[in-house]
Amino acid sequence: MADRYYLYGIFPAPGPADLPLDGLDAQTVQAQHLGDFTFLYSVACQKRYLSSRKNLLGHEKVLEAAMEQGHRTLLPLQFGLIVDSWEQVQDDLVDPHSEDLAQLFKRLDGCREVSIKVQWEPSTELEMMMAEDATLRAQRDQLEGTQLGMEQVIFIGQQIEAAMEARKQGIADQFRQALTPLAKDVLENAPQTDVMIYNAAFLIPWESEAEFSQAVDAVDASFSDRLRIRYNNFTAPYNFAQLN
C-alpha cells in the first residue's frame, strides 16, 4: 500500500531540511519541496490521529524544532491533516492558493505569535467590589436581611452581575491598552473557562518579545496577586496563519 503523509507545516523554500527529529508514531520528519514552498511531513501510520495530548504535543514539537533552528516564518497546518499524494497537495493547496500563501508569509516574516490568558477569582473580586461600592453592598444586604419580591431580587442580582462584568472588562482593558500598541495584529479569543477573563494572541516583531513580556509583567504587578496569568512566548502562529 502506498505511503500516506502527515503534514505539520509550510515554510518558504528552501525551508528546514534534515531535522534530527521524530514526528508522530516516531516517524522521521522529512521535507518536501513544492514550488516556492516546503512542507514538513512524516509517514502516516494511522488512518486518522486522535487529538490526544501526546499527539497534539508531538505535532507542535516538530514546528517548534524548526523554529529553534531559525526557520521562524511558517504556516502551521491543522492537527490531523493527512494526504494521499503530493499531487493532491499541489492541486488542492499550492496551485489555487500560492499567491495567498506568499502574502501570508510576507505578513508573518520577522514576527512571532505570543499569547496571554488571564484568570481571576470571582468570589474574591466580588468581595472586593462590595467593599468598594456602598450602593451594591446595601443592595446585597437587602437580599440577606429583608423579605423582597421576586422582581426586586432579580433586579439586585442583575445589578451585581452587571457590575462584575464591568469590573472584568476593566481588567481586560488594562491589558489591551498596555499590549495592543506593541503588536502588529491582535486576535481575541473566547475565554476557555468560567474564571478566564481575557484570552488573546498578539503578532509582534520577533525582537520585541522582551519589551512585550515586561509590559505583561507590569500590568500583572498592578493587580498584586489577584490574577493568574499564562503567557506563551514561543508558539507557531496558528492565530495569524489563516487563508482567506
Locate predicted features.
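An interfacial alpha-helical scaffold signature
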Residues: 1-230, 234-244
